[in-house]
Amino acid sequence: MAKTELSKLEWLAKAQAYCARAEHCAADVRRKLYEWGLQDAEIADFIEENLYSDNFLDDSRFCAAYVHDKVEYQSWGRLKIQAGLRALQLPESEISQALKNIDEIAYFGNLRKLIRSRSADSEDKRLRFLSQRGYTFDEIRKCSDR
């Protein structure tokens, strides 16, 4: 059977399996459905509604996982994390709530580690690097003073 001939329920089962493997947002699921060959926006809407109602998709859970992973594994700052979540078209309320729950100790520990690793660079170069990582000037100054 060709991919375009899959029924709504077969598309839904495929999307559920995708969501069961890792935390995803609605934009990720839609992108994946279109990669798989789904062309019908009505079926994509049906799948998205079902994934939300069956708790396969949850914006607050996704935002929390995204924020945790970006802080823990990639040492991103708040601004870069916020931009990444906005790019995924998540609700602003969920984004701000997830950003409020950042582990401050780990967050500023990462920033201090990045500052130490770039200590040989000029001050301007280090500031530019940390800004690209999403840290604010105030956060950088706060950790540089210590």
Question: Over which residues does each language-model region extend?
Answer:
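An alpha-helical, amphipathic repeat domain used for nucleic-acid recognition
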Residues: M1-R146
